[in-house]
Amino acid sequence: MTTPRLILASASPARRRLLATVGLTVEVQPSHFDESLVQLNDPPALVQELAFRKAASVARSQTEPALVLGCDSVLAINGEICGKPASPAEAIARWQQMRGQWGELHTGHALIDSASQRRWLACGTTRVRFAEVEDAEIKAYVATGEPLACAGAFALEGKGGLFIAEIQGCHTNVIGLSLPLLRELLLAADYPLLQAWQT
């Protein structure tokens, strides 16, 4: 059995690194789906729909069979969705509000077989407690630019990891891709995971 092509419908370097870490070779084909077309207030439903739309947009463009993986993440604090900050000032204000607080990082996962259009969906939720960081730390962190590119204004795998006091649940979900959930999706799709390690 040949190993099917696995396509990551995301430009996220963190997701690509996670996949490489577990020995999965992927083609990167970022989705250009307009996320503003999806307006949902429920965080898990939002990320699940966005992950599906991203994967579907890339799956439709395939001329050869492939499994397409789409993901989307969002942070919610007290049920309020916190996306990527639009400016440094917004990132600073966000951090001043969330320091010392618990948040929930939701990541939607969608795997689509481009040939059969079969789909497998999952959403992972991880609780994160932010440290009691000082204003000077917040401003220095925002000045690095890292928070401006991340859901929730932090990157666990980057400098932002210094400001995470506690994690309850899957830590790779916080980075943008739950490896345990990915395994479940690949198994459901009959992807030969162990064989992929041998190629």
Curated annotation (Swiss-Prot):
Signal sequence bounds: none
- Which compartments is it annotated to reside in? Cytoplasm
Name recorded for this polypeptide: Nucleoside triphosphate pyrophosphatase
Q: Which superkingdom?
A: Bacteria
- Return the broad EC class: hydrolase
HAMAP family listed in its UniProt record = Maf (MF_00528)
> Does the UniProt entry include the keyword Nucleus?
no
User: Which keywords annotate this record?
Assistant: Cytoplasm, Hydrolase, Nucleotide metabolism
Free-text function comment from the UniProt entry: Nucleoside triphosphate pyrophosphatase. May have a dual role in cell division arrest and in preventing the incorporation of modified nucleotides into cellular nucleic acids.
**InterPro entries associated with the record:** ITPase-like_fam, Maf-like
Similarity annotation: Belongs to the Maf family.
What this protein needs as a cofactor is:
a divalent metal cation
Q: Name one GO biological process term.
A: nucleotide metabolic process
Q: Write down the species.
A: Synechococcus elongatus (strain ATCC 33912 / PCC 7942 / FACHB-805) (Anacystis nidulans R2)
